[in-house]
């Protein structure tokens, strides 16, 4: 286990673990070595971008996003390129995902839900005014900063998840239909603004109710419910909240409430604080032009450096609030898409136990040394769930197991982890047991 670990650098950024992965892009945590600031690094494969004729669309959207400077939108700092990759440097949401709050605490109090919804509408309205649409609003895109303010990610980068066909209309293959508007599912082409607002309505419903308005184990039945606008509000919703949700979740995009009308709604306006920020007059687009002109003189330097494996795993565990599985999702520097716990036994035995626990849950498993990638074989109605695990040695008989989501629905990840943790309960190291460390 005491093998060297590869440390990757891209220009001034020291690249860390994978946070998420899609068809065209992978997102990694990184640190700006000049400032110490944590960032998210979205990595695109140039070959795939060119193959799907997406270069010009992505270039336009990146140029637009560099002009966006809103407190509720994840900032796009700069764009870099190597010979084979494009790197988009983004603001890092240190407070984790908003929907982790739902998983931990259940539905939110109305005043808290309203605050987040107001911030969401602020972000969406501002971006729409600049001609930028999201088209894929879902829990994974709703992050929090260190102060607990909402940050919407992936605004303007919709070319990575959409297709424009010969009719000139927007068409999306939707991996998470629960949040998609009826006109998106009908695939007849749609307006990005009204579709975004529908998704905001679904998000508001979940914040207030603690569950999805449209849910069914059968995908076709789910589609029918969404297209018909068939859902039921829980009895605890206030009349004002219910009225607004009904007006947003109108299956007819022509009669659906608009954002200006939402801003004038009595329930929405309560304790409303408009976003305060300074507009950028201009943004430097030289880095974007250099990336898409593919000028070799502007290519960023990529380095891989070998470093010894960190031996502070036990310190990390000791610093945690609890060492057992009662605290399922520990924060690591504020980010909550992962959990970790101490486990007894040899590393190879732990790998086998994780494999044995995951296979009955329908996961395909890839192993490389003490890292594993788990993916559910058949995508459900919420798309594929991908999970990465890694085992770190503390002593020959004590290890730290890290489990993190790399793709998919947050709620599904939490469900998977609970099942996995139950299966591994016999090997979890509890506080007070012998650690196997020499005194």
From Swiss-Prot:
It comes from the Eukaryota. Residues 306-330 form the NAF domain. Residues 13-268 form the Protein kinase domain. The active site is at 136 (proton acceptor). It catalyses: L-seryl-[protein] + ATP = O-phospho-L-seryl-[protein] + ADP + H(+); L-threonyl-[protein] + ATP = O-phospho-L-threonyl-[protein] + ADP + H(+). It is found in: Cell membrane. The keyword Transferase applies. ATP binds at residues 19-27, 42. Keywords: ATP-binding, Cell membrane, Kinase, Manganese, Membrane, Nucleotide-binding, Phosphoprotein, Serine/threonine-protein kinase, Transferase. One of its GO terms (molecular function) is ATP binding. The modification Phosphothreonine is found at residue 172. One of its GO terms (biological process) is signal transduction. Its EC number is 2.7.11.1. Its main location: membrane. Its cofactor is Mn(2+). Residues 336-365 are annotated as: PPI. GO terms for cellular component: plasma membrane; plastid. The modification Phosphoserine is found at residue 158. CDD domains: CIPK_C (cd12195), STKc_SnRK3 (cd14663). Belongs to the protein kinase superfamily. CAMK Ser/Thr protein kinase family. SNF1 subfamily. Interacts with RBOHF (via N-terminus). CIPK serine-threonine protein kinases interact with CBL proteins. Binding of a CBL protein to the regulatory NAF domain of CIPK protein lead to the activation of the kinase in a calcium-dependent manner. Involved in the calcium-dependent regulation of reactive oxygen species production by the NADPH oxidase RBOHF. The activation loop within the kinase domain is the target of phosphorylation/activation by upstream protein kinases. The PPI motif mediates the interaction with the ABI (abscisic acid-insensitive) phosphatases. This is CBL-interacting serine/threonine-protein kinase 26. It comes from Arabidopsis thaliana.
């Amino acid at each position: 286990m005491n093998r060297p670990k590869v440390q990757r650098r891209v220009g001034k950024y020291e690249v860390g673990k994978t946070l998420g992965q899609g068809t065209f892009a992978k997102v990694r945590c990184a640190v700006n070595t000049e400032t110490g600031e944590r960032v998210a690094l979205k990595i695109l494969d140039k070959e795939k971008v060119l193959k799907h004729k997406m270069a010009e669309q992505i270039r336009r959207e990146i140029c637009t996003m560099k002009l966006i400077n809103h407190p509720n939108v994840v900032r796009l700092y700069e764009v870099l390129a190597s010979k084979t990759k494009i790197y988009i440097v983004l603001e890092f949401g240190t407070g984790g995902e908003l929907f982790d709050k739902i998983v931990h605490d259940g539905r939110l109090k109305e005043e808290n839900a309203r605050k987040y919804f107001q911030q969401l509408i602020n972000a969406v309205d501002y971006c729409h005014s600049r001609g930028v649409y999201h088209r894929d609003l879902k829990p994974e895109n709703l992050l929090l900063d260190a102060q607990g303010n909402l940050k919407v990610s992936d605004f303007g980068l919709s070319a990575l998840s959409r297709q424009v066909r010969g009719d000139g209309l927007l068409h999306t293959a939707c991996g998470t239909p629960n949040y998609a508007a009826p006109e998106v599912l009908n695939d007849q082409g749609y307006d990005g603004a009204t579709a975004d607002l529908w998704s905001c309505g679904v998000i508001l419903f979940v914040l207030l109710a603690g569950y999805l308005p449209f849910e069914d184990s059968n995908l076709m039945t789910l589609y029918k419910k969404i297209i018909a606008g068939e859902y039921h509000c829980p009895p605890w919703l206030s009349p004002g909240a219910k009225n607004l949700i009904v007006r947003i979740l109108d299956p007819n995009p022509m009669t659906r409430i608009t954002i200006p009308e939402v801003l004038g709604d009595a329930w929405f306006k309560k304790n409303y604080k408009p976003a305060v920020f300074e507009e950028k007059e201009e943004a430097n687009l030289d880095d974007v032009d250099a990336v898409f002109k593919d000028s070799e003189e502007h290519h960023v330097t990529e380095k891989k450096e070998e470093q010894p494996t960190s031996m502070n795993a036990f310190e990390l565990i000791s610093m945690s609030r609890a060492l057992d599985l009662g605290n399922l999702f520990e924060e690591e520097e504020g980010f909550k898409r992962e959990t970790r716990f101490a486990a007894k036994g040899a590393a190879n035995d732990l790998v086998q136990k994780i494999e044995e626990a995951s296979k009955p849950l329908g996961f395909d498993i890839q192993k490389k040394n003490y890292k594993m990638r788990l993916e559910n074989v058949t995508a459900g109605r919420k798309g594929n769930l991908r999970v990465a695990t890694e085992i770190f040695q503390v002593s020959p008989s004590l290890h730290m197991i890290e489990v993190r989501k790399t793709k998919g629905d947050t709620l599904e990840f939490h469900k998977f982890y609970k099942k996995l943790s139950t299966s591994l309960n016999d090997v979890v190291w509890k506080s007070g047991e012998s650690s196997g460390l020499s005194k």
